[in-house]
């Protein structure tokens, strides 16, 4: 028996156009989106099936990938494929309105939900880390997080700088699949940014895709550029090759004062995602194989240094926040008792949006034709005519965001508007205005689909941060509503033991049956976010539930 392989020297790209390689668009769509996740324009390390986020994979190994592709090509529209941690394990007869694929990734019984146990299973070929959209086949490159990061920076600017980030600069680190959105998001928000990254290949990737503008030669050069650009009121992003655990303390020592500090290194995974200070990347990867415990310890010690520097900036009055990579938790475990003194980005800036079911709604053109996305952009503006902020986002996205793989768009909208847009897109497919079907999905980072006490559900006002019934209910409801594929994951964003979350994708193929499914899914999915926050007592969510006519028996029911 051959050993399953996680490496293959191959380039994968999703088919384009209207010729089907599967039996229908309901199975062609997950096939193309799986392949798109591994497109070299999209994935961080596609030859090892890694899409983003440390070791977030699209399939468990290449043999599993091959079998998933073969199965999707043969799957009928009354069958459902079950995928267990990146491995196709069964096909069962269901019905036409059931999901075509159901996915469960990285889920462990809570007592065993640790990186140590997961890594043992991974080494034996028994598990796969799916991150959020890697193993659920709806990653669209760094664009997928750009708007969320942009909204965060804009809201921070409103709270701390009277809504004007001109002449200001953001200090951060990490230019991977998620962190790579930061420089462009800061630029779009009107600020300069200094973005520290320890791998030159990642800087090169972001320079090619125009997510970062320039690379500095060294720290002195970077600071000189920041000083010049902020004085000129320009919003320019600068990458700097280096280690944040070395550079941030040096900035504190020099008395440098940024206007905002955050971080998006892959601190959630100390074995694979955070380079210890003083180490080369090659040493880090080699020692991860030979002495993983020592590597984890060294990485977490460096995170403690990194967080202490962030705390020092906060103590100077600099707005400082965690951007959801669990670095505060790692530092706390290394003795930084006050690591949580600076907040996470969700309670600080994003939760009011979640209360209204607003989150990272995204869609991709299965045709591969950018014009299909531009036509949907215009349709969004037509259907939401009075939202100047949203229109500005769409204009900036078209001008500045390079498509990676299949053309796609991210657009934060909430309950009511998601269904309205989805039905309009389906009608555009029906009439031929769009050249092929559209898929609509979202990040698992959404209002009703995640339990993550150090990120999305941090500091819930009723103390329900760790209650994970909500993403389970979300996945169950999306399955019952007829999403095309539904996923339920553990550990995304913040690592093993710290989150559970669910995702959905639905196909707009122009049919009447699709319209019925779209209306259900794109109402019920954000509806669970409003429900979750209303249940926690947020008045904004309670008001939204009443306005939208949600039936919440303990809250909105008439007595």
UniProtKB/Swiss-Prot annotation:
Q: What PANTHER family does this protein map onto?
A: UROCANATE HYDRATASE
Active-site residues (renumbered): 411
Q: Which reaction does it catalyse?
A: 4-imidazolone-5-propanoate = trans-urocanate + H2O
User: What does it do?
Assistant: Catalyzes the conversion of urocanate to 4-imidazolone-5-propionate.
Q: Which GO terms describe its cellular component?
A: cytoplasm
Which terms are listed as keywords in the entry? Cytoplasm, Histidine metabolism, Lyase, NAD
Involved pathway(s): Amino-acid degradation; L-histidine degradation into L-glutamate; N-formimidoyl-L-glutamate from L-histidine: step 2/3
Q: Which molecular-function annotations from GO does this UniProt entry contain?
A: urocanate hydratase activity
Indicate what this protein is called per its UniProt record: Urocanate hydratase
- Family, as annotated: Belongs to the urocanase family.
Give the gene name: hutU
- Organism field: Pseudomonas aeruginosa (strain ATCC 15692 / DSM 22644 / CIP 104116 / JCM 14847 / LMG 12228 / 1C / PRS 101 / PAO1)
Q: How is the cofactor bound?
A: Binds 1 NAD(+) per subunit.
PROSITE patterns in the record: UROCANASE
- Annotated residues for binding of NAD(+): 53-54, 131, 177-179, 197, 202, 243-244, 264-268, 274-275, 323, 493
Mind giving the lineage of the organism this protein is from?
Answer: Bacteria, Pseudomonadati, Pseudomonadota, Gammaproteobacteria, Pseudomonadales
EC number(s) per UniProt? 4.2.1.49
Query: Where is the protein localized?
Result: Cytoplasm
């Amino acid at each position: 028996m051959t050993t399953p392989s996680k490496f293959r020297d191959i380039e994968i790209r999703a088919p384009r156009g209207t010729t089907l390689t599967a039996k229908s668009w309901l199975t062609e769509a997950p096939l193309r989106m799986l392949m798109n996740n591994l497109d070299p324009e999209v994935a961080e390390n596609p030859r090892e099936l890694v899409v983003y986020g440390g070791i977030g994979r699209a399939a468990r190994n290449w043999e599993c990938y091959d079998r998933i592709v073969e199965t999707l090509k043969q799957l009928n529209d009354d069958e459902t494929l079950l995928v267990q941690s990146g491995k196709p394990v069964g096909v069962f007869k269901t019905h036409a309105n059931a999901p075509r694929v159901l996915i469960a990734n990285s889920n462990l019984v809570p007592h065993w939900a640790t990186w140590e146990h997961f890594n043992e299973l991974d080494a034996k070929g028994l598990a796969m880390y799916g991150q959020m959209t890697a193993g659920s086949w709806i990653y669209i490159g760094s664009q997928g997080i750009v708007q969320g990061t942009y909204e965060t920076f804009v809201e921070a600017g409103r709270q701390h700088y009277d809504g004007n980030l001109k002449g200001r600069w953001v200090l951060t680190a990490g230019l991977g699949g998620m962190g790579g959105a930061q420089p462009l998001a800061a630029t779009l928000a009107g600020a300069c940014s200094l973005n520290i990254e320890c791998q030159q290949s990642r800087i090169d990737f972001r320079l090619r895709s125009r997510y970062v503008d320039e690379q500095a030669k060294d720290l002195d050069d970077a600071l000189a550029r920041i000083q010049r650009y902020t004085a000129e009121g320009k919003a320019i992003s600068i990458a700097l090759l280096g280690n944040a655990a070395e550079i941030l303390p040096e900035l504190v020592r020099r008395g440098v004062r940024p206007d905002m500090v955050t971080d998006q290194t892959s601190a959630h995974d100390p074995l694979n995602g955070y380079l210890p200070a003083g180490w080369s990347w090659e040493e880090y990867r080699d020692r991860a194989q030979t002495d993983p415990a020592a590597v984890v310890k060294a990485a977490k010690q460096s995170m403690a240094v990194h967080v202490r520097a962030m705390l020092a900036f906060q103590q100077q009055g600099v707005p400082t926040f965690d951007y959801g990579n669990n670095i505060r938790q790692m530092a706390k475990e290394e003795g930084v008792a006050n690591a949580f003194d600076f907040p996470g980005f969700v309670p600080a800036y994003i939760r009011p949006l979640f209360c209204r079911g607003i989150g990272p709604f995204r869609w991709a053109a299965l045709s591969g034709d950018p014009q299909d996305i531009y036509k949907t952009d215009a349709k969004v503006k037509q259907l939401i005519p009075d939202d100047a902020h949203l229109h500005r986002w769409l204009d900036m996205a078209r001008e500045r965001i390079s498509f990676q793989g299949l053309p796609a768009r991210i657009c934060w909208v909430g309950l009511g508007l998601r269904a309205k847009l989805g039905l309009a897109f389906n009608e555009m497919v029906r009439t031929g205005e769009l050249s092929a079907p559209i898929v609509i999905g979202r990040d698992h980072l959404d209002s009703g689909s995640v339990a993550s006490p150090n990120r999305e559900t941090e500091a819930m006002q009723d103390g329900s941060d760790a209650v994970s019934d909500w993403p389970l209910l979300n996945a169950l409801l999306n399955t019952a509503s007829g999403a095309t594929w539904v996923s339920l994951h553990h550990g995304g964003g913040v690592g093993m033991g710290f989150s559970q979350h669910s995702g959905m994708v639905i196909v707009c193929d122009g049919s009447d049956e699709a319209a019925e499914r779209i209306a259900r899914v794109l109402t019920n999915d954000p509806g669970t976010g409003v429900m979750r926050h209303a249940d926690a007592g947020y008045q904004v969510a309670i008001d939204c539930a009443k306005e939208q006519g949600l039936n919440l028996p303990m809250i909105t029911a008439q007595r």
